A protein has these predicted regions:
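Flexible, non-catalytic linker and terminal segments flanking ANL/adenylate-forming cores
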Residues: 1-22
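ANL superfamily adenylate-forming
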Residues: 130-183
């Protein structure tokens, strides 16, 4: 297991220690669970509230689900997600799996997204259903893209976000990342 970061607040500015074996998603989630916050609200959206315990399970399921789809350490996934629980789930799940999330603004053009897909060499696109039309013309000829995962659905024959969660594991060990590995 990776170690957690530490901060010495007795000095100004605080001295931060990030250990060699480090995974940012593991640090964020485990720090809150260890502090007894599993039942505390971590994320609030129109559809409901999610506790740190619920977020931890979603992160585990999504990270392991991405690995089950063949995504591996240092592969990239492009995230074009609106402000729902699926964003922190995908972002942190990818990081915990050692996969690099490339989060993009949801107000861009298809041309902008085309550049980002090619430049990042994303192997998967994780997209909110209402943004899928912006990506539709880009998908057939993309040389690196292997998977399209749609939040709030599974439109047009693409994989549904909820299915990746359902097939993932509730317990999932973090990838053996280090403090100087690419993270996002």
């Amino acid at each position: 297991m990776p170690s957690l970061s530490a901060a010495d607040h007795s000095v100004s500015p605080p001295k931060i220690h990030i250990p060699r074996d480090y995974n940012a998603a593991y640090d964020l989630i485990e720090r809150n669970l260890s502090a007894g916050r599993a039942s505390k609200v971590a994320f609030l959206e129109d559809r409901g509230r999610y506790t740190f315990g619920e977020l931890a399970e979603r992160v585990n399921r999504f990270g392991s689900g991405l690995q089950a789809m063949g995504l591996a350490m240092e592969h990239r996934v492009l995230l074009a997600l609106t402000d729902t629980i699926d964003f922190p789930t995908a972002f942190l799940g990818a990081i915990k799996a050692g996969i690099i999330p490339v989060a993009v603004n949801t107000l861009l053009t298809s041309r902008d997204y085309e550049y980002m897909l090619f430049d990042s060499r994303a192997r998967a696109l994780i997209v909110s259903e209402q943004l899928l039309a912006q990506f539709a013309p880009l998908l057939p000829n993309h040389p690196f893209l292997k998977h399209v995962i749609v939040s709030s659905g599974g439109a047009s024959g693409h994989k549904a976000f909820r299915d990746v969660l359902a097939k993932g594991l509730p317990e999932f060990s973090p990838a053996p990342t280090t403090c100087d590995d690419p993270c996002f």
